UniProtKB/Swiss-Prot annotation:
Annotated membrane topology: Single-pass membrane protein
InterPro entries recorded: Cholesterol_7a_monooxygenase (IPR030681), CYP450_sterol_14alpha_dmase (IPR050529), Cyt_P450 (IPR001128), Cyt_P450_CS (IPR017972), Cyt_P450_CYP7A1-type (IPR024204), Cyt_P450_E_grp-IV (IPR002403), Cyt_P450_sf (IPR036396)
Name of the molecule in the record: Cytochrome P450 7A1
Cofactor(s) recorded in Swiss-Prot or TrEMBL: heme
Database matches in PROSITE patterns: CYTOCHROME_P450
EC number(s) recorded for this UniProt protein: 1.14.14.26, 1.14.14.23
Family: Belongs to the cytochrome P450 family.
An annotated GO cellular component: endoplasmic reticulum membrane
The protein's role, per its UniProt record: A cytochrome P450 monooxygenase involved in the metabolism of endogenous cholesterol and its oxygenated derivatives (oxysterols). Mechanistically, uses molecular oxygen inserting one oxygen atom into a substrate, and reducing the second into a water molecule, with two electrons provided by NADPH via cytochrome P450 reductase (CPR; NADPH-ferrihemoprotein reductase). Functions as a critical regulatory enzyme of bile acid biosynthesis and cholesterol homeostasis.
Originating species: Sus scrofa (Pig)
Lineage: Eukaryota, Metazoa, Chordata, Craniata, Vertebrata
Length: 501
């Protein structure tokens, strides 16, 4: 009698053969080169997930600047020539950026669709977010973040500021703790329950956030959250803390959160809270590793440390601000923060080396895509993808691309450099850690400002040094490739000590 395992093997083999004969997509005339992969449905997903950059480079060498890969049942057209990026964006009427992003958000955070076309919101949620993250609203948010960062950092100097001692800590852990607490209370307000209780609440939320963030890549990939018991529990606890009855007890809630609660008026309280959890994740998941890389690269480079410290001191002096341990926090306005080209260059260079975002748009109909390298037919529901890390690490655009150069984004006059070339042609898009076009991160201005504020305070309050002065740069954690800024695969110990103010 045929064994069950043998029968199962035969059935699997037959199914694979049927897929190869009937279900496998075939390249049509005028379409980009096609890679189906050898595993039904998964296609090339395993190879791409293992090392996206090398996978795309290999296919670029094999097929040229555009090719199609099957990934988890989707057909993705990768555009790898940065000279064609702006041409992709010119086809906006054929492309839908919302479908993928809103679907991924609903999967990961557990709320109903927040796409306005589905009727669950009273307004375009993306417009609401943009409106509350620019202009006067951004100024208020940045001022609150600057104050909260100082409230979080000041306990580091206690209890004997007259006899400062070195404190050793993991740099990523330090950045995670400081940025999470300051960012959380900036957006969602302070609970008037006393300092110790507030600190305990934040630490609990921090632990839950880490647990949830661990499983986030799997959720976006389509795995059900019930598979991850600890991560699922963490998500529900985080969302519970963002319910309306909890928020009403807090002081100084941001305009962003208040406006979103109004915009999501058709959702019940539980789903509103899960939508706000999406805001929490978006405000922390990339900012925290970005902050680490900026601080690490600055401390590691004596030239960067010297140039940054000089710029910070000059800016504070010009603004009439003095670092002290009294109750008066320092404050820099929008114009002053925007007039710091050295810090801007350090942040850009750090993000260039650590970002691995995937810019995605879905074809709304069959159409012809006209690029720098030719024209290609695209089918409805196919995905157009840009992977800017290819550009960020291109030696023709960025000589010696793996080396941190703090002044890479400064011109000969010390001003912001905006001119970069590929094959002798000026690039319109040369720096894309925050996406592009309609998919550009609406919180990018605030993210850069809070990182800049953190660096200003760290350089002003503390003497800083690495425990191992010649430590190697930690590898990037590739498990988050496609989601934004990659964290370090291991922490780096550093020491900080209060300056004699």
């Amino acid at each position: 009698m045929m064994s069950i395992s043998l029968l199962g093997g035969i059935v699997t083999a037959v199914c694979c053969c049927l897929w190869l004969l009937l279900g496998m997509r075939r390249r049509q005339t005028g379409e980009p080169p096609l890679e189906n992969g050898i595993i039904p449905y998964l296609g090339c997903a395993l190879q791409f997930g293992a090392n996206p950059l090398e996978f795309l480079r290999a296919n670029q060498r094999k097929h040229g600047h555009i090719f199609t890969c099957q990934l988890m049942g989707n057909y993705v057209h990768f555009i790898t020539n940065p000279l064609s990026y702006h041409k992709v964006l010119c086809h906006g009427k054929y492309l839908d950026w919302k479908k993928f992003h809103f679907t991924a958000s609903a999967k990961a955070f557990g709320h109903r669709s927040i796409d306005p076309s589905d009727g669950n919101t009273t307004d375009n949620i993306n417009k609401t977010i943009i409106k509350t993250l620019q202009g006067d609203a951004l100024n208020l948010l940045a001022a609150a973040m600057m104050e909260n960062l100082q409230l979080v950092l000041r306990p580091q100097v206690a209890p004997q500021p007259e006899k400062p001692a070195w404190v050793t800590e993991g740099m990523y852990s330090f950045c995670y703790r400081v940025m999470f607490e300051a960012g959380y209370v900036t957006l969602f307000g302070k609970d008037p329950i006393g300092h110790d209780a507030q600190k305990a609440l934040i630490l609990n939320n921090l632990d839950n956030f880490k647990q949830f963030d661990k499983i986030f890549p799997a959720l976006v990939a389509g795995f059900p959250i019930h598979v991850f018991k600890t991560g699922h529990y963490a998500r529900e606890k985080l969302a519970e803390g963002l319910r309306l009855q909890k928020l009403r007890k807090r002081d100084h809630i941001s305009e962003l959160v208040r406006f979103l609660n109004d915009t999501l008026s058709t959702l019940d309280d539980a789903e509103k809270a899960k939508s706000l959890l999406a805001v929490l994740w978006a405000s922390q998941a990339n900012t925290i590793p970005a902050t680490f890389w900026c601080l690490f690269q600055t401390i590691r480079s004596p030239e960067a440390m010297k140039a940054a410290s000089e710029e910070v001191n000059k800016t504070l002096e010009k603004a009439g601000q003095k670092i002290s341990l009294d109750d008066k926090p320092i404050y820099l306005n929008q114009i002053e923060l925007d007039s710091m080209p050295v810090l801007d260059s350090i942040i850009k260079e750090s993000l260039r080396l650590s970002s691995a975002s995937l810019n995605i748009r879905t074809a709304k109909e069959d159409f012809t895509l006209h690029l720098q390298d030719g024209s290609y037919n695209i089918r409805k529901d196919d995905i157009i993808a840009l992977y800017p890390q290819l550009m960020h690490l291109d030696p023709e655009i960025y000589p010696d691309p793996l080396t941190f150069k703090y002044d890479r984004y400064l011109d000969e006059n010390g001003k912001t450099k905006t001119t970069f070339y590929s094959h002798g042609l000026k690039l319109k898009y040369y720096y894309m850690p925050f996406g592009s076009g309609a998919t550009i991160c609406p919180g990018r201005l605030f993210a850069v400002q809070e990182i800049k504020q953190f660096l200003i305070l760290m350089l002003s309050y503390f003497d800083l040094e690495l425990v191992e002065s010649h430590v190697k740069c930690p590898p990037l954690d590739q498990s988050r490739a496609g989601l934004g800024i990659l964290p370090p695969s291991n922490d780096i110990e550093f020491r900080y000590k209060l300056k004699h103010l």
